[in-house]
């Protein structure tokens, strides 16, 4: 940022171990921001502003600077959510000096279901109408989909005093899940969101259930967008069905001249989808029905082999099951892969509700 840093906010956090939390901030944000570490301090720089965090007497002093009031609220929320996540249930006090009350999130968009259709036997697409699709055009592609209880007027969340999202409770409780904006139709002012259908005994899938039953006129909301697309001339993309909408969006947004290798694991050939792209795109489909976990040819083996054969300058993007993501992240670390040229995320965990 430059001289446009006109909106400022300060806060103080009292974690159980301030040194450890500062280390976690540096470790986590290196894949998402420009991280400048110094003795007892870190400066985070991103498109929405800067966060200057200093260690003072076992507390963290936070100074935010952003170009608009909206991005200031977003930055405050981002820092607050991460600090409580890093605390992992341990005591944490976080307060902000002269923070304004936010009754409704600045990046919350109420949308209306237009249609729902099956793309493949296990992937269902919901199209929603949005008054302003401008924020969704460009590099930020992930949103929280908010599904209100049926039969009640939606009560959308705001920001609490500590900067975290204040979710409605009781009868107004909302289901929230993270999804990818698969495509934006600017002229129609519509957004596409693909939902993986994966029924399993004893596993709740509220997001998938919503898509299965979605009706035109139904109201939901989106928080975002966030999660920028990788920018590189050469990309390695890897994931399963849960990551397929994101892989498809990355391929669609990639510029002509870029080279992309994609490894995608799906149930069988009926789950393969066309992936339009202006880039040079090579897709290797893996079929779960014909692969054996832990044997040569499995998803993890294919991804690690592809990483080992990366050309210099390749950005590696992987999204998959939690334990697989951890193994692939460890493999990248072992090979000394540049943290700024990778993004490895887990989208679901075996045996737990994720959709």
Features from the language model and the residues they span:
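Extended, composition-driven regions rather than compact fold-specific motifs
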Residues: 1-355
């Amino acid at each position: 940022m430059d001289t446009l840093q006109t909106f400022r906010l300060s806060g103080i956090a009292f974690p159980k171990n301030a040194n450890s939390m500062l280390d976690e901030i540096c470790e986590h944000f290196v894949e998402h921001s420009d991280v400048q570490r110094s003795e007892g301090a870190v400066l985070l720089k991103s498109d929405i502003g800067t966060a200057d965090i200093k260690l003072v007497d076992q507390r963290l002093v936070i100074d935010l600077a952003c170009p608009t009031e909206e991005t200031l609220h977003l930055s405050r929320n981002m820092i607050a959510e991460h600090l409580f996540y890093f605390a992992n249930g341990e005591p944490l006090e976080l307060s902000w000096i002269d923070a304004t009350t936010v009754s409704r999130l600045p990046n919350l968009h109420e949308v209306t279901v237009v249609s729902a259709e099956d793309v493949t036997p296990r992937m269902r697409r919901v199209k929603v109408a949005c008054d302003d699709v401008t924020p969704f055009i460009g590099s930020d592609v992930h949103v929280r989909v908010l599904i209100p209880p049926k039969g009640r007027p939606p009560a959308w969340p705001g920001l609490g005093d500590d900067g975290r999202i204040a979710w409605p409770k009781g009868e107004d409780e909302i289901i929230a899940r993270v999804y990818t904006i698969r495509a934006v139709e600017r002229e129609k002012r519509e957004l596409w969101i693909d939902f993986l259908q994966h029924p399993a005994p004893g596993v709740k899938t509220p997001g998938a259930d919503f898509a299965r039953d979605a009706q035109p006129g139904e109201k939901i909301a989106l928080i975002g967008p966030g999660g920028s697309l990788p920018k590189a001339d050469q990309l390695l993309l890897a994931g399963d069905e849960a990551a397929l909408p994101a892989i498809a969006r990355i391929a669609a947004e990639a510029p002509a001249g870029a080279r992309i290798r994609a490894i995608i694991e799906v149930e069988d050939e009926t789950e393969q989808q066309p992936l339009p792209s202006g880039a040079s795109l090579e897709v290797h489909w893996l079929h779960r029905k014909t692969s054996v976990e832990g044997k040569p040819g499995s998803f993890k083996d294919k991804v690690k082999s592809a990483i080992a054969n990366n050309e210099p300058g390749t950005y590696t993007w992987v999204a998959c099951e939690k334990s697989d993501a951890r193994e692939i992240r460890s493999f990248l670390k072992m090979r000394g892969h540049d943290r700024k040229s990778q993004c490895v995320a887990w989208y679901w965990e075996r045996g737990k509700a994720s959709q």
